[in-house]
From Swiss-Prot:
The lineage of its organism: Bacteria, Bacillati, Mycoplasmatota, Mollicutes, Entomoplasmatales. Belongs to the bacterial ribosomal protein bL17 family. It comes from Mesoplasma florum (strain ATCC 33453 / NBRC 100688 / NCTC 11704 / L1). Keywords: Ribonucleoprotein, Ribosomal protein. This is Large ribosomal subunit protein bL17. One of its GO terms (cellular component) is cytosolic large ribosomal subunit.
Amino acid sequence: MSYIQKQGKNTAWRVALMRNLTSELIVSERLEITETRAKELRKHLDKMVTLAKRGDLHARRQAASWLRNIEASSKEDVLQKLFTTIAKKYKDRDGGYTRILKLDNRKGDNAPMVIIELV
């Protein structure tokens, strides 16, 4: 499929990467990664925030099947943070939950780097 950024890896690797990056972005709310990964990550994060805004049990289970179970703080994990803090923050916003800011290219391989953050 031409709309998927394959990044030279197999499907399992790409899915695992996106699950990890989505969970990490919810925890830290800001990541410094390559531009291609950030553009692909944006799609997955928008879906997770939309599920969190819906807020029902089925949406919570769908999000739980995608996100890694890591602690966001000593009091809450990723799923709780998504459904409480982030869902309330974006309840009046229809899409566009992330911002991508360009940085200089990476020194080792000249890959275009960006900062992706929650708006």
